[in-house]
């Protein structure tokens, strides 16, 4: 476990070698200084111990200020506390150069991403002036993921609620349409029944008129038959009267005949008497 911890805390040797050789080339520009492996390991371990001590001292100043994010001012105060004040000016100048380079890189990247985005360029330059807050970012990442997950769940819940409301609305509309259709069908049936009743009434009226016409025709037939009977009775009366007249004529004829007979008898009797 201790060996793994040393490996984890050990600084990258390539970076340590590059930093050391750059400084040595400034100190001895006439010749190239070679670095032994053990010397490189010693530089690496010394830098690690120095960084640990410097970070612990800077953390104390950060706690005194009641902040959770360490700033460059905390590191500067820690260097003064460790009696490295002579390194503050070159450290601050190198830090300003780093800020300018970093701001230029971010501005170029923002301009490439947003060609006409002046506001995006301004915001990127404003964020570049701030130091990196790696610790705070790591703490905020889980909360951001939780917030994103929660917002996603809320969106899904809202979508499901909207779908449920739409389904209920469609069902209600379908029921309303069915009720309207059923009412329309009932109204149509009522209209048809009303029309049929009207037709039945018209047929009844027509039948009534026909019955009235039949009754009138029957009355006319009765009157005609009565008139015919009256005419027949008159004719029979005329016949009886003619028969009576004929009878009276016959009687007169008979009487005349009887008179002639009696006359002839008298004539016969007178003739006999004359004889």
Swiss-Prot record:
This protein's record includes keyword Coiled coil: yes
Induction of synthesis: Repressed by heat and dehydration stress.
Motif, Nuclear localization signal: chain positions: 135-142
Molecular functions per Gene Ontology: DNA binding; DNA-binding transcription factor activity; protein heterodimerization activity
Subunit structure: Heterotrimeric transcription factor composed of three components, NF-YA, NF-YB and NF-YC. NF-YB and NF-YC must interact and dimerize for NF-YA association and DNA binding. Binds directly with DPB3-1.
Free-text function comment from the UniProt entry: Component of the NF-Y/HAP transcription factor complex. The NF-Y complex stimulates the transcription of various genes by recognizing and binding to a CCAAT motif in promoters.
The protein's name: DNA polymerase II subunit B4
Lineage: Eukaryota, Viridiplantae, Streptophyta, Embryophyta, Tracheophyta
Gene: NF-YB11
